[in-house]
Amino acid sequence: VLSGDDKSNLKTAWGKLGGHAGEYGAEALERMFVAYPTTKTYFPHFDVSHGSAQVKGHGKKVADALTTAVGHLDDLPGALSALSDLHAHKLRVDPVNFKLLSHCLLVTLANHLPADFTPAVHASLDKFLASVSTVLTSKYR
């Protein structure tokens, strides 16, 4: 459960991404593909090389979904319901992959926002991404 401090930390940190959210989403995907090559199996039709337009496009989708989630912290299940259905029923993504991408997002954000990535912000982002992952996997049962 996200506390009031977590919600404040998230809104402040996410606001500092500015117009870079899509870029950071793509970078996190690239990190995931390099660090966890088996994740590429969910993107057989993608050029997963560095700087690929497809990775950039999907990175923007990831960032947009997270931006939506940050805007609906009190109703993540409602805000992410369609995305949860998509990943559970159509794409059938192994739930562990959400944790892998979450880790890569944390690394990417820490790299780009070192002064803002305090232990409290790190903890809030980690809790948020875990909550998003839980919602995205909730319809697998």
UniProtKB/Swiss-Prot annotation:
InterPro entries: Globin (IPR000971), Globin-like_sf (IPR009050), Globin/Proto (IPR012292), Hemoglobin_a-typ (IPR002338), Hemoglobin_oxygen_transport (IPR050056), Hemoglobin_pi (IPR002339). The modification N6-succinyllysine is found at K7, K11, K16, K40. GO terms for molecular function: haptoglobin binding; heme binding; iron ion binding; organic acid binding; oxygen binding; oxygen carrier activity; peroxidase activity. The modification Phosphothreonine is found at T108, T134, T137. It comes from the Eukaryota. Heme b binds at H87. O2 binds at H58. Red blood cells. One of its GO terms (biological process) is hydrogen peroxide catabolic process. The modification N6-acetyllysine is found at K16. Keywords: Acetylation, Heme, Iron, Metal-binding, Oxygen transport, Phosphoprotein, Transport. PROSITE patterns: GLOBIN. The keyword Acetylation applies. Involved in oxygen transport from the lung to the various peripheral tissues. Belongs to the globin family. Heterotetramer of two alpha chains and two beta chains. This is Hemoglobin subunit alpha.
